């Protein structure tokens, strides 16, 4: 599902809301989540899951084309951990 699909589905299920309002709400939610992670904080949505940052230490990688060794810098990457309710819903398929 893409962001456009999400907006379309929400607009059709919440017909009392204008599509532009739904789009603005989705955009604002995603921006708020990105800003929260950017500031180093964790996001927890009970029953759904949590978003956090995981630290990746610097390491020596390899260029797949040339085989040349490349120094990779340390970085933080976003991580999603599904909640119990979401895991149970997905596993019941």
UniProtKB/Swiss-Prot annotation:
Presence of keyword Transcription: yes
Pfam families registered for this protein in UniProt: Bac_DNA_binding (PF00216)
Alphabetized PROSITE patterns for the sequence: HISTONE_LIKE
Gene Ontology MF terms: DNA binding; structural constituent of chromatin
GO biological processes: DNA recombination; regulation of DNA-templated transcription; regulation of translation
A cellular component annotation (GO) from this entry: chromosome
UniProt KW keywords: DNA recombination, DNA-binding, Transcription, Transcription regulation, Translation regulation
CDD domains: IHF_B
Superkingdom assignment: Bacteria
Residue stretches spanning the membrane: none
InterPro entries: Hist_DNA-bd, Histone-like_DNA-bd_CS, IHF-like_DNA-bd_dom_sf, IHF_beta
Family in the record: Belongs to the bacterial histone-like protein family.
NCBIfam families attached to this UniProt entry: hip, PRK00199.1
Quaternary state and interactors: Heterodimer of an alpha and a beta chain.
Known role: This protein is one of the two subunits of integration host factor, a specific DNA-binding protein that functions in genetic recombination as well as in transcriptional and translational control.
Protein name as annotated: Integration host factor subunit beta
Gene designation per UniProt: ihfB
């Amino acid at each position: 599902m893409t962001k456009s699909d999400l907006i379309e589905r929400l607009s059709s299920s919440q017909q009392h809301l204008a599509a532009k309002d739904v789009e603005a709400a989705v955009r604002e939610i995603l921006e708020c989540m990105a800003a929260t992670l950017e500031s180093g904080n964790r996001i927890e949505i009970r029953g759904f899951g949590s978003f956090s940052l995981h630290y990746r230490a610097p390491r020596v990688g390899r260029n797949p084309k040339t085989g040349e060794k490349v120094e990779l810098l340390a970085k933080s990457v976003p991580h999603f951990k599904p909640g119990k309710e979401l895991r149970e819903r997905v596993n019941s398929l």
